[in-house]
């Protein structure tokens, strides 16, 4: 893998992990568009660990307060968030553990299917953004809502859906304000990324030394871009919502269709 490819894929992961555009779809589609070889599993781990670092650094004060108050003051607003995050993590972690390899094998080269998923979820994102009644902050959230967000997060395994996209959309449907839905999506991302990253890293630890250069480049690029993506999304959500990401999904789906037809 060239340095350019490692940087480019790191940028895609950093953006796609936190913007509702599906990082997994981008990491499949763009190498296909450019005719690149499929990247290794250990490089994929590096990209995800980079975005984990991004969210931990961006929200480090929140995480410390959530953990401390979750233990010492579990009924406080911040204390409840710890248990909401735990509950929301369980369904996705379980689904990922049992079905991740199956989903990856089914979707790996199904470019048209990914295009369809991108477009369909784009319509859902647009509709929910336009019609949802955003009344509540995270302090109004309850554990059943957290559980529902977690259950639907499991579907993010399918390339084109987007973990951040489906969790934010579910939050909006449940009445959360846009910024609150985005923040909860980011906060609950750390455990699921950490769990998946550690499991994959342990399985492929022997490959790290031979691919250390691309591993390091992908890690730091996705971390830096991921940090900026979090800030960008929170800012754009305050101003204009999620519609811009729906439009992007439509354009990418159309591009995939055109390229696929030209290559027949």
UniProtKB/Swiss-Prot annotation:
Presence of the UniProt keyword DNA repair in the record: no
Pfam families: BacA
Organism: Caldicellulosiruptor saccharolyticus (strain ATCC 43494 / DSM 8903 / Tp8T 6331)
Gene Ontology annotations for the cellular component aspect, listed alphabetically: plasma membrane
Residue intervals passing through the bilayer: 14-34, 40-60, 79-99, 112-132, 141-161, 182-202, 214-234, 242-262
Name of the protein: Undecaprenyl-diphosphatase
EC class: hydrolase
EC code: 3.6.1.27
Task performed by this protein: Catalyzes the dephosphorylation of undecaprenyl diphosphate (UPP). Confers resistance to bacitracin.
Entry's localization field: Cell membrane
Membrane topology field: Multi-pass membrane protein
InterPro entries given in the database record: UppP (IPR003824)
């Amino acid at each position: 893998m060239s340095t350019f490819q490692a940087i480019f894929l790191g940028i895609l992961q950093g953006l796609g992990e936190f913007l509702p555009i599906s990082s997994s779809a981008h990491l499949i589609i763009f190498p296909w568009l450019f005719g690149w070889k499929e990247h290794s599993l250990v490089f994929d781990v590096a990209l995800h660990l980079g975005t984990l670092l991004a969210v931990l650094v961006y929200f480090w004060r929140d995480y410390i307060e959530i953990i401390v108050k979750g233990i010492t003051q579990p009924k406080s607003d911040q204390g409840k968030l710890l248990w909401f995050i735990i509950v929301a993590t369980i369904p996705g972690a379980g689904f990922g553990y049992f079905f991740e390899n199956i989903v990856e094998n089914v979707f790996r080269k199904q470019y048209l299917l990914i295009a369809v998923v991108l477009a369909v979820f784009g319509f859902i994102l647009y509709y929910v953004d336009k019609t949802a009644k955003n009344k509540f902050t995270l302090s109004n959230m309850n554990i059943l809502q957290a559980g529902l967000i977690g259950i639907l997060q499991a579907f993010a395994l399918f390339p084109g859906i987007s973990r951040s996209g489906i969790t934010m959309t579910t939050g909006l449907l449940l009445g959360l304000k846009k910024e609150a839905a985005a923040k909860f999506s980011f906060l609950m991302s750390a455990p699921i990324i950490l769990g998946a990253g550690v499991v994959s890293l342990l399985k492929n630890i022997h490959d790290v030394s031979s691919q250390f250069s691309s591993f390091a480049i992908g890690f730091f690029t996705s971390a830096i871009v991921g940090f900026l993506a979090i800030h960008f999304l929170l800012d754009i959500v305050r101003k204009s919502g999620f519609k811009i990401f729906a439009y992007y999904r439509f354009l990418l789906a159309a591009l995939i269709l055109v390229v696929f037809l030209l290559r027949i």
